[in-house]
């Protein structure tokens, strides 16, 4: 298993096209960045996109469990500008056997500039009924807690 530093701490350079007329990041970009960071974290951990996300090219089998977003939050502490090199810290947490969330901290030179949170619920793809998280996500969540104290 790779070091969690490799898959829970990511980098992102803010592109000009992600900013508004004032040169600062438009609010909705943060949610896109959060989801992209989650996808990259899964890939770096060793989970193929096709194992989690339907519609992937060359997919052999459609995932039987979907992970829709059921809640999201975003807070900007400081303006984020085009050209900023951000560090993204992910903190996944299992909430129950069928639900988890990921907290995201966006830092510029060790200063928090934004935070995000996305919560996912596991549902059976066909019936849309709640179910347990798929095994790859369970393993990713478990590995993310190694060396970190969990609340009782």
Swiss-Prot record:
Hydrolase as UniProt keyword: yes
This protein's record includes keyword Hydrolase: yes
Known EC number: 3.1.2.28
Pathway assigned in UniProt: Cofactor biosynthesis; phylloquinone biosynthesis; Quinol/quinone metabolism; 1,4-dihydroxy-2-naphthoate biosynthesis; 1,4-dihydroxy-2-naphthoate from chorismate: step 7/7
GO MF term list: 1,4-dihydroxy-2-naphthoyl-CoA thioesterase activity
Keyword list, A-Z: Hydrolase
Gene Ontology biological process terms in this record: phylloquinone biosynthetic process
Catalytic activity: 1,4-dihydroxy-2-naphthoyl-CoA + H2O = 1,4-dihydroxy-2-naphthoate + CoA + H(+)
Domain of life of the organism encoding this protein: Bacteria
Gene3D superfamilies assigned: Hotdog Thioesterase
Active-site residues from the entry: 20
Record family assignment: Belongs to the 4-hydroxybenzoyl-CoA thioesterase family. DHNA-CoA hydrolase subfamily.
Its biological purpose: Catalyzes the hydrolysis of 1,4-dihydroxy-2-naphthoyl-CoA (DHNA-CoA) to 1,4-dihydroxy-2-naphthoate (DHNA), a reaction involved in phylloquinone (vitamin K1) biosynthesis.
Full protein name: 1,4-dihydroxy-2-naphthoyl-CoA hydrolase
Organism: Synechococcus sp. (strain CC9311)
């Amino acid at each position: 298993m790779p070091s969690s530093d490799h898959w829970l701490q990511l980098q992102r350079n803010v592109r000009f096209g992600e900013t508004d007329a004032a040169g600062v990041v438009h609010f909705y970009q943060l949610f896109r960045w959060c989801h992209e960071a989650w996808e990259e974290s899964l890939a770096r951990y060793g989970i193929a996109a096709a194992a989690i996300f339907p519609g992937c090219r060359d997919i052999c089998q459609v995932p039987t469990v979907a992970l829709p977003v059921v809640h999201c939050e975003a807070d900007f502490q400081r303006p984020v500008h085009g050209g900023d090199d951000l560090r993204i810290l992910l903190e996944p947490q299992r909430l129950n056997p069928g639900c988890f969330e990921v907290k995201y901290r966006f830092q510029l030179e060790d200063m928090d500039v934004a935070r995000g949170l996305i919560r996912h619920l596991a549902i059976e793809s066909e019936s849309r009924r709640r179910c347990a998280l798929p095994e790859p996500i369970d393993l990713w969540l478990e590995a993310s807690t190694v060396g970190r104290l969990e609340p009782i």
